[in-house]
Amino acid sequence: MAKHVKVAVTGAAGQIGYALLFRLASGQAFGLDTTVDLHLLEIEPALPALKGVVTELEDCAFPLLCNMVVTSDPRVAFNDVNWALLVGAAPRKAGMERKDLLEKNGSIFAGQGKAINENAASDVRIFVVGNPCNTNCLIAMNNAPDIPKDRFYAMTRLDQNRAIGQLALKAGVDVPSVKNMIIWGNHSSTQYPDFYHATIDGKPATEVIRDKNWLLNDFIPVIQQRGAAVIKARGASSAASAANAALDSVWSLINTTPADDNYSVALCAQGQYGVDEGLIFSFPCRTENGVVSVIEEIEHNEFGQQKLKETLDELREERDAVEALGLI
């Protein structure tokens, strides 16, 4: 029997939104057996541009796309939705400190959390793309007290996909040969792209790629700084690759994970790996019959433990900063 899902997308007229919506409407996130309503949220000045995007969506005549709502009111956007994809966020501008960015986005995500809490469907799931996504997710979660904390996620799949691509290039293999590539922690330059537990054609990545210097001193910094490299090269942040990773994430959160693999997503920690309960931290996860769980039996060497500590410390600092601002 055909299924139906209502999906809110914030920042819908932005570059990521533009790269995301057509693929959402064609069934690439929820499957070809699921019809979709799109609730599109934008700030008032961007509504004319969003109407242009809606015109294009209509012109595609997607069989799975049923209804579209265009609004600048979060209460309307989140009304009765099953998924809220929080893509829109205030960009970091020249001279802006990270604290300023947290404050500016904090008010946006606090308001959206409240609106989701009051208006969304009882089974709503929230996926945050807008940066700093871990802490934006934390803010939304803490402003939606009636929604179970395990329904909130932030995106680290883009980092995972970047890492898989780099390992495949270095090893001279196809992308599907690389599995179990884990991103730990924050979606920032402190993230830990964990090649030690990755596999290539079923073997440990460190056995296939024997160049330890490359793994430690090239691979990790390249993944950590990849977003900045894209901005430098094209004058704008990652859009198509971010939209692609968001679709991958939603698919992985819904569908059962293959037995020989896992995926990375940031979610509300419950004390796993020594991470403070309530922090939004990226872990290796699996989905089984619609239930998402963190893989808990992974052991870290000394290097890995240090990397986990670095990214955990940063997330604690961000949490403390938004707490001081009264956002959580």
From Swiss-Prot:
GO terms for molecular function: L-malate dehydrogenase (NAD+) activity. NAD(+) binds at G11, A12, A13, G14, Q15, I16, G17, N105, Q112, V129, G130, N131. GO terms for biological process: malate metabolic process; tricarboxylic acid cycle. It is an enzyme of class 1 (oxidoreductase). It catalyses: (S)-malate + NAD(+) = oxaloacetate + NADH + H(+). The active site is at H187 (proton acceptor). Keywords: NAD, Oxidoreductase, Tricarboxylic acid cycle. InterPro entries: L-lactate/malate_DH, Lactate/malate_DH_C, Lactate/malate_DH_N, Lactate_DH/Glyco_Ohase_4_C, Malate_DH_AS, Malate_DH_type2, NAD(P)-bd_dom_sf. Substrate binds at R92, R98, N131, R162. CDD domains: MDH_chloroplast-like. It holds the Pfam family Ldh_1_C. It comes from the Bacteria. Its EC number is 1.1.1.37. Catalyzes the reversible oxidation of malate to oxaloacetate. Belongs to the LDH/MDH superfamily. MDH type 2 family. NCBIfam families: MalateDH-SF1, PRK05442.1. This is Malate dehydrogenase. It comes from Coxiella burnetii (strain Dugway 5J108-111).
